[in-house]
Regions:
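Binuclear metal-dependent hydrolase catalytic cores
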Residues: 1-122
Length: 122
């Protein structure tokens, strides 16, 4: 297993990115601003994201990443999170006001993202 630290800060500044870890080449733990340092090809290879919670320093790059590579992936990005985190993302980010609801785009049967509920200890 290869773990690449993309960011581990609670704020942004020069050489300072918010929380995100790339596991091997296909799994993200959180999606902070460090995701923006990945190439489009690296983003395209990510198949799943595990979110620890809904604070912006852990999810800020998620909508931008999906927007950047959604059409090039060929399959939905799976977002694993607690039910309350998924609810917060739907209500405050992927709501067609702040950002498009990519769980229904390009269609509900073939979306760019799929939310997967997990439980503590799972």
């Amino acid at each position: 297993m290869r773990i690449r630290v993309l960011g581990c800060s609670g704020a942004i500044a020069k050489d300072c990115r918010t929380t995100s870890f790339l596991i091997d080449d296909d799994t993200l733990i959180d999606a902070g601003t460090g995701v923006g340092d990945l190439t489009l090809d690296e983003m395209r290879r990510i198949d799943r994201v595990f979110l620890t919670h809904s604070h912006l320093d852990h999810v800020a790059a998620l909508p931008l990443m999906v927007d950047s590579v959604g059409t090039a992936r060929g399959k939905p990005l799976k977002i694993h999170a607690l039910p309350e985190t998924i609810q917060a993302l739907r209500a405050h980010i992927f709501n067609d006001l702040i950002w498009p609801d990519f769980s229904r785009i390009p269609s509900e049967s073939d979306p760019f993202i799929q939310f997967r509920e997990i439980a503590i200890g799972q």
